Amino acid sequence: MAFENLKISRHISSSTKNLLKAKKIMAALASNPQMLTRQAHGNKKEQLWRKESLNLEKKCGFCVSVYSNEKLGRSHMEKEWRLKAFWSNIAQPTTLEMEPINNVEELDAVLSHARQLSQPIIIEWMASWCRKCIYLKPKLEKLAAEYNNRAKFYYVDVNKVPQTLVKRGNISKMPTIQLWKEDEMKEEVIGGHKGWLVIEEVRELINKFV
């Protein structure tokens, strides 16, 4: 019986403490009604930020993260938008325009820069009257985007450059796609067959040297 009375006494004591805490909180809110206003305002702003995040994600295809941070007990909300590409083709280009090489000096400069980066370069030797050359150029520019920062792509129009440059490449047929590395021509593909086969051969060529 004494044990049961003790349990009841403890329960009443605990309830009394909770009631006193509740009264203190109510008294604090009554004396400072701005606390409720700030909390409600903060919740409303949080909902607005999240709504705008969803709208932006639907429209732009971006992942949007909203971060809330309260420091040192202050009711201060810090918002930070962080946009990340949802599709890989947003982050990387789908095509890279090939740059022309106009003379031997430019070729030497290109090779020197590639040597410093320890990267190969691809050169399409072409002519404006060569239909196959014109057909391959945009496909090679797509391949250039695929190997961006690993290999650099160039072209030489043999009708617009000195013959010393053409002889440097030892060109006899067009289109000819060559891979150069460490100041030397390593391998080449003669593009007389189907375009997709040429591109695959060039890709295999690059993979051997990157």
Swiss-Prot record:
Per UniProt, the keywords (alphabetical) are: Chloroplast, Disulfide bond, Electron transport, Plastid, Redox-active center, Transit peptide, Transport
Hey, what's the signal peptide range on this chain? Answer: none
Q: Which domain of life is it from?
A: Eukaryota
Principal localisation: plastid
What are the cysteine partners in each disulfide bond? C130-C133
Recorded GO cellular component terms are:
chloroplast stroma
Subcellular locations according to the entry: Plastid, Chloroplast stroma
InterPro entries the record matches:
Thioredoxin-like_sf, Thioredoxin_domain, WCRKC1/2
**Domain Thioredoxin: from-to ranges:** 81-210
Active site (UniProt): C130 (nucleophile), C133 (nucleophile)
**Biological role:** Probable thiol-disulfide oxidoreductase that may participate in various redox reactions.
According to its UniProt record, which protein family does this protein belong to? Belongs to the thioredoxin family.
Name listed for the protein in its UniProt record: Thioredoxin-like 3-1, chloroplastic
Organism field: Arabidopsis thaliana
> Encoded by which gene?
WCRKC1
